[in-house]
């Protein structure tokens, strides 16, 4: 059996923009762990704006895992935040209810740059545009 570094990653409760949080645990597996082998894990939600100090337990539910190529036997574990019962999504967990909204739409945007003579189209031929230019 090999020891694996499981890096649990989740979004905290800060607004308007949540931050990424992480904590690591070491567990032994015969091979790279699969999602169903990863346990739920508790954390103190009072330090992440996801609970009050008097009742601060929250749970991390693994929803995806990927090899961490920067560490030997590392695994990145993407998590949802759940209430202490482990089944109810935390109010800051907007991902858990996304499929309940029939009007949810997602789009992808691909950006392109057009070049002429090795510079972006419209750039001056002898340098760069002014710092606050129209580009």
Segments from the language model and where they lie:
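Glycine-rich, acidic/polar active-site loops that bind/position phosphate-bearing ligands
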Residues: 1-135
